[in-house]
């Protein structure tokens, strides 16, 4: 037998390389075949629930890194909650109605205006379900576990029926009304938009200053050559002007410039004078805003049109002139002010953004609104009322789907009245927990400031508004009509609205005093898609999915404070008086490595599927766990490669632990904690602390700290310390020796506990690790998080070993200096004498019996007594003297020993190794030992 054959070298088939792109798919198939998701829930039946309600992604296109961040975070939470013992189901969902799907059909050459509506909607449904199937495959490939065979989908009949009932309950409670008021209007999609469907981009717009001649100053202001001065960025709205708003709290100045007088806000006067080039002007009069109410101006270029002066507190002195042009059909503030003063709404624009015959200037009829800016400018100039024209860049509202500008346009729509139950909503926000905490303020302020919700849309693909109209135009919505429509939708889906005549959509024998002839018509608009997803708390129940209400958590991107978090809260409070969630967790956006938004034009997008093919889903999952996603997070291939290095470190550490516990049977070889060597007890205590802190961080949804703690433990406590000196015990000591079994106990425990703690983050790899451990559960996901032990001596151990670690640092510094001086090469070439300080000596006394030489990986260690030699190095905890070790290298333990050949039967070995080999391999005493 050769010397190396006497060593207890670790062996394992656990591969060094994960080959993740190939093997992950195999593991995922096994999870599905073995029904691990269902079995985990079965284990937790009857336990406290944790329900994470999935915010439905839109079923259109390939998944992106934002999807990956979101879905993996949810999966980490659900897995960790299940491993804590909660009953934590996960039911994925999809949002399947809306304009993007219509746009995709248009790209395929489908013209909805030439088709039967029901047939067109069937094409939309088919396309949406194809997208669901594609995304379902991609999400599962990220390692996300859930009830993928029974998702909730907003186009499913039962879901649509539930949504109709939510609408009906809101109507019954008095929260739904029809009105004509300005809403965001997308001419590019020919539909209204909710606030959540609007995004902002920089555009270049006109900036013009216009004078309105005073017609009636009510005896307080001269009409002769006197003008009200306004500023606007929308010249196209000037023909529809109905009034001028002033702030009742502001002071105004009448200034003389040449032969004209202008009324300007006093605090804006100097800025306006500079812009208009008034080198000299004279203030001739002061007015209060209240003085000007009900004064009348002439339209700046349309004969016979007047403009009323009205009070409005929203007028600011941040920009402009302190007087604001008001057109009731093209602005929410304009509308509200005009209504207070008894105006009719003037909104002379069609669905495509072109002016209708209602416009007071007939030259503009049929023209696209922005094309009229130049015409209006020229007419103002000809009338002598254009004082200044320039352009400037500012942020303007755009349709989030088409990326085209939107306008405020007054149209007849259906609304949810937020004002009627705003206080209830705000009260529910106060009772909700937010991660991060600032989310509470953000959502609170959005609800506090938001106007009524326009819920009708002029599109084809969506859930129809379940409203009928009588012969006299009266809208009809009753409990009976809602239930009848909902029951029909539950059987046939919402396409029934378009395939059945109105008589079949109404309850049998339905009558109304408003239809003496029994004739009715049905609404053609559909519900806002945010009403779809905002009703998901109800739809998922109607589908019989395993999600309780109110649910434990909603988790989405921070844009959903104005989207899904918002709409879900409104529908739930409006119908049941409670928030649909107990907690809300929001995430930032995924940016590239330089902090830029990802876009195809910049070429900085990363597709999760491409990463999976190159590196594996585990690398994406580890990236998700490593970042603080409460804000925006960067991702690039370079960043993912760095994450991959971290993964490799984790994998190799597990491989070492598995190899060196391959001959360890925890049932018969385990050493009880009280009998462990003190250094092993210390590592058990450190491991226990790691488990406790990790579970706390899982409960705080702080996965970055879980990863940091685990990686630090693996890198510092295991690789750089414990496993570094472990070879001297694991390889050299007797196979069944107490020291070796003690250390194997700790290493095995570390492998088991770390696998459990990392399982929610790296389920593929930890499942692979689990297959090499001797645990009873079939998969790590079927086990629970480790129990937290109560070690009575934990504090004493940490204090004593903490002092030793400081001493160790001093010894390592001394060894490094000896290396620099060429005194030694490897640390085992050294003989070290330590003269400990008081704190270190006290710690060493408490740890008496430990082999510190072994821990320091030196050939000889002496605790010096008496006077410290002059050549010793002085450090914080001790003085250290390093000499080259005497003796010869033992070929087995690689230490310098002076007792080689002490056992004549094994002359090559030192006394320690000879004794061990004789005990483990007595046959060698007969056969002899080769080098």
From Swiss-Prot:
Amino-acid positions noted as binding Zn(2+) in the UniProt annotation, renumbered to this chain: 890, 893, 910, 913
Motif ('HIGH' region): 57-67
Cofactor(s) annotated in UniProt: Zn(2+)
Origin superkingdom: Bacteria
Cellular compartments annotated: Cytoplasm
Reactions the enzyme catalyzes: tRNA(Ile) + L-isoleucine + ATP = L-isoleucyl-tRNA(Ile) + AMP + diphosphate
Positions of short motif 'KMSKS' region: 597-601
A Pfam short name: tRNA-synt_1
Gene Ontology terms for molecular function: aminoacyl-tRNA deacylase activity; ATP binding; isoleucine-tRNA ligase activity; tRNA binding; zinc ion binding
Record keywords, A-Z: Aminoacyl-tRNA synthetase, ATP-binding, Cytoplasm, Ligase, Metal-binding, Nucleotide-binding, Protein biosynthesis, Zinc
Gene Ontology biological-process annotations: isoleucyl-tRNA aminoacylation
Cofactor annotation remark: Binds 1 zinc ion per subunit.
Classification via HAMAP family: Ile_tRNA_synth_type1
PANTHER family: ISOLEUCINE--TRNA LIGASE, MITOCHONDRIAL (PTHR42765:SF1), SOLEUCYL-TRNA SYNTHETASE (PTHR42765)
Comment on protein domains: IleRS has two distinct active sites: one for aminoacylation and one for editing. The misactivated valine is translocated from the active site to the editing site, which sterically excludes the correctly activated isoleucine. The single editing site contains two valyl binding pockets, one specific for each substrate (Val-AMP or Val-tRNA(Ile)).
Chain's role: Catalyzes the attachment of isoleucine to tRNA(Ile). As IleRS can inadvertently accommodate and process structurally similar amino acids such as valine, to avoid such errors it has two additional distinct tRNA(Ile)-dependent editing activities. One activity is designated as 'pretransfer' editing and involves the hydrolysis of activated Val-AMP. The other activity is designated 'posttransfer' editing and involves deacylation of mischarged Val-tRNA(Ile).
Quaternary structure and partners: Monomer.
UniProt name for this protein: Isoleucine--tRNA ligase
Lineage: Bacteria, Bacillati, Bacillota, Bacilli, Lactobacillales
Recorded name of the encoding gene: ileS
């Amino acid at each position: 037998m050769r010397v190396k054959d006497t060593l207890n070298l670790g062996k394992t088939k656990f591969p060094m390389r994960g080959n993740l792109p190939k093997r992950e798919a195999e593991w995922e198939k096994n999870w599905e075949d073995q029904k691990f998701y269902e079995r985990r829930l079965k284990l937790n039946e009857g336990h406290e629930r944790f329900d994470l309600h999935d915010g439905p992604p839109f079923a259109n296109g390939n998944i992106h890194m934002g999807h990956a961040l979101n879905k993996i975070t949810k999966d980490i939470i659900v897995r960790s909650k299940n491993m804590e013992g909660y009953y934590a189901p996960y039911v994925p969902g999809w949002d399947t109605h809306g304009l993007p799907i219509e746009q995709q059909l248009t790209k395929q050459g489908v013209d909805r205006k030439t088709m039967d509506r029901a047939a067109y909607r069937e094409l939309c449904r088919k396309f949406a379900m194809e997208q669901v199937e594609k995304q379902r495959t991609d999400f599962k490939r990220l390692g996300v576990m859930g009830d993928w065979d029974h998702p909730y989908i907003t186009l499913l009949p039962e879901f649509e029926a539930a949504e109709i009932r939510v609408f009906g309950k809101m109507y019954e409670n008095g929260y739904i009304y029809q009105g004509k008021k300005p809403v965001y209007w997308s001419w590019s999609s020919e539909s209204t938009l909710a606030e959540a469907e609007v995004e902002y981009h920089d555009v270049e717009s006109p900036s013009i200053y216009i004078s309105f001649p005073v017609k009636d100053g009510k005896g307080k202001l001269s009409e002769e050559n006197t003008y009200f001065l306004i500023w606007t960025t929308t010249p196209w709205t000037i023909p529809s002007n109905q009034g001028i708003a002033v702030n009742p709290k502001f002071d105004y100045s009448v200034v003389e410039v040449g032969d004209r007088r202008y009324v300007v806000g006093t605090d804006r006067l100097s800025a306006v004078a500079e812009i208009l080039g008034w080198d000299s002007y004279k203030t001739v009069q002061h007015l209060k805003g209240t003085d000007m109410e009900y004064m009348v101006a002439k339209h700046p270029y349309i004969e016979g049109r007047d403009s009323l002066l009205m009070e409005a507190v929203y007028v600011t002195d941040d920009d402009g002139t302190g007087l604001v042009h008001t057109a009731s059909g093209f602005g929410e503030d304009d509308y509200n002010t005009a209504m207070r003063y008894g105006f009719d709404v003037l909104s002379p624009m069609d669905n495509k953004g072109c002016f209708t015959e209602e416009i007071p200037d007939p030259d503009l009829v049929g023209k696209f609104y922005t094309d009229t800016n130049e015409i209006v400018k020229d007419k103002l100039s000809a009338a002598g009322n254009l004082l200044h024209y320039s352009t400037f860049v500012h942020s303007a509202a755009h349709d989030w789907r088409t990326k085209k500008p939107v306008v405020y346009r007054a149209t007849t729509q259906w609304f949810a009245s937020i004002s009627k139950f705003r206080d209830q909503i705000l009260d529910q926000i106060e009772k909700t927990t937010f991660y991060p905490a600032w989310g509470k303020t953000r959502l609170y302020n959005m609800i506090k400031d938001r106007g009524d919700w326009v819920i009708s849309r002029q599109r084809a693909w969506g859930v129809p508004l379940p409203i009928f109209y009588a012969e006299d135009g009266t809208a009809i919505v009753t409990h009976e009509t809602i239930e009848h429509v909902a029951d029909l939708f539950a059987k046939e889906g919402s396409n029934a609205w378009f395939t059945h005549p109105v008589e079949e959509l109404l309850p049998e024998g339905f009558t109304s005093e408003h239809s003496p002839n029994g004739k009715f018509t049905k609404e053609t608009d559909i519900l806002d898609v945010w009403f779809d997803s905002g009703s998901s708390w109800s739809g998922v129940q109607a589908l019989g999915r395993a999600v309780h209400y109110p649910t434990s958590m909603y988790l989405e991107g921070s844009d959903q404070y104005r989207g899904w978090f918002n709409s879900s809260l409104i529908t739930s409070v409006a119908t049941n008086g409670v928030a649909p969630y107990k907690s809300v967790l929001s995430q930032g956006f995924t940016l590239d490595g330089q902090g830029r938004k990802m876009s195809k034009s910049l070429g900085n997008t990363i597709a999760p599927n491409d990463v999976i093919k190159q590196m594996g889903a585990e690398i994406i999952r580890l990236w998700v766990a490593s970042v603080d996603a409460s804000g925006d997070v960067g991702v690039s291939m370079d960043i993912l490669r760095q994450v991959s290095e971290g993964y490799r470190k984790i994998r190799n550490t597990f491989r070492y632990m598995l190899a060196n516990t391959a001959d360890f049977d925890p049932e018969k070889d385990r050493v009880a904690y009280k009998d462990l060597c003190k250094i092993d007890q210390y590592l058990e205590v450190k491991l226990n602390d790691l488990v406790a802190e990790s579970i706390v961080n899982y409960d705080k949804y702080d996965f970055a700290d879980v990863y940091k703690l685990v990686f630090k433990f693996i890198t510092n406590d295991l690789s750089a310390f414990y496993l570094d000196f472990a070879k001297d015990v694991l390889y050299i000591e007797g196979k069944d020796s107490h020291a070796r079994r003690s250390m194997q106990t700790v290493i095995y425990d570390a492998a088991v506990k770390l696998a459990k703690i990392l399982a929610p983050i790296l389920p593929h790899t930890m499942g692979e690790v689990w297959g090499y451990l001797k645990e009873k559960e079939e998969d790590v996901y079927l086990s629970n998080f480790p129990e937290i032990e109560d070690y009575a001596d934990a504090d004493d151990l940490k204090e004593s070993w903490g002092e030793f670690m400081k001493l160790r640092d001093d010894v390592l510094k001394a060894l490094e200096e000896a290396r620099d001086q060429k005194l030694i090469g490897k640390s085992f070439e050294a003989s070290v004498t330590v003269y400990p300080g008081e704190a270190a000596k006290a710690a060493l006394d408490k740890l008496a019996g430990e082999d510190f030489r072994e821990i320091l990986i030196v050939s000889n260690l002496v605790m010096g007594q008496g006077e410290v030699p002059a050549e010793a190095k002085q450090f914080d905890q001790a003085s250290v003297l390093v000499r080259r070790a005497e003796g010869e290298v033992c070929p087995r333990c690689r230490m310098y020993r002076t007792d080689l050949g002490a056992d004549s039967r094994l002359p090559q070995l030192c006394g320690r190794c000879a004794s061990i080999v004789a005990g483990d391999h007595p046959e060698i005493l007969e056969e002899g030992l080769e080098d």
